[in-house]
């Protein structure tokens, strides 16, 4: 399955969950805030399998991954010490593209991935073009000097950097200082269902 490149707003409505983490998709006055489709405003009771699949899909779309990438990230989480439920989130949050977004250097994860792909991001002073690169604690991330004035970078300044990163929005340089705690991560996802889903496959 390839990475989803369609409307994030539609997917947010489908799952009743803000994939942009801003609730912008559900602002009063929007044409539709319920799920897309002819019967989108009708709730359907899901089976246990359906609930697991839905939570997996929500997390996958939130971080902008395809199935293969998500499964690979889950395998990384399984080899980490601690609770697998939290480690699944930590592995996702430790991706380079996600941390570029968390530091306020890009307005969305999709934009952050684009910056990494095009060589605008440095990791410990070296250009890295792999969005899935797993960043270690205390590593530094910065926008390349020639890229700091890009509109897409300026747009990221509206994001408040998370507490688990040390970010300077003026110099466009930051550090991954600690792993996030559960209350610092997106609400509305049952990660236990995600773990149950992948445990059947991995």
Curated annotation (Swiss-Prot):
The UniProt record lists the keyword Phosphoprotein: no
Record-level Gene Ontology MF annotations: rRNA binding; structural constituent of ribosome
Q: Any idea where the S4 RNA-binding domain is? A: 94-157
Coiled-coil positions are: none
Classification via Gene3D superfamilies: Ribosomal Protein S4 Delta 41, Chain A, domain 1 (1.10.1050.10), RNA-binding S4 domain (3.10.290.10)
Q: Does the keyword Ribosomal protein apply?
A: yes
The record's listing under Pfam families reads: Ribosomal_S4, S4
Q: Report the sequence similarity comment from the record.
A: Belongs to the universal ribosomal protein uS4 family.
Function description: One of the primary rRNA binding proteins, it binds directly to 16S rRNA where it nucleates assembly of the body of the 30S subunit.
On assembly, the entry states: Part of the 30S ribosomal subunit. Contacts protein S5. The interaction surface between S4 and S5 is involved in control of translational fidelity.
> What is the protein name for this chain?
Small ribosomal subunit protein uS4
Organism field: Malacoplasma penetrans (strain HF-2) (Mycoplasma penetrans)
């Amino acid at each position: 399955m390839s990475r989803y490149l369609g409307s994030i707003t539609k997917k947010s409505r489908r799952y009743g969950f803000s994939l942009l983490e801003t609730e912008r998709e559900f602002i009063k006055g929007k044409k539709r805030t319920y799920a897309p489709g002819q019967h989108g405003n009708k709730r359907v009771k899901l089976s246990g399998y359906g609930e697991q699949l839905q939570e997996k899909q929500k997390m996958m779309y939130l971080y902008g991954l395809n199935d293969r990438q998500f499964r690979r990230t889950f395998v990384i989480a399984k080899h980490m010490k601690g609770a697998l439920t939290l480690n699944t989130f930590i592995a996702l949050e430790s991706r380079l593209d996600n941390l570029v977004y968390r530091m306020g250097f890009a307005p969305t994860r999709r934009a952050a991935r684009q910056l990494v792909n095009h060589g605008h991001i440095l990791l410990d002073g070296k250009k890295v073009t792999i969005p899935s690169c797993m960043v270690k604690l205390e590593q530094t991330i910065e926008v390349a000097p020639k890229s700091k004035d890009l509109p897409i970078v300026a747009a990221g300044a509206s994001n408040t950097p998370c507490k688990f990163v040390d970010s300077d929005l003026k110099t466009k340089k930051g550090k991954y200082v600690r792993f996030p705690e559960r209350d610092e991560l997106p609400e509305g996802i049952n990660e236990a269902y995600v773990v149950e889903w992948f445990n059947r496959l991995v």
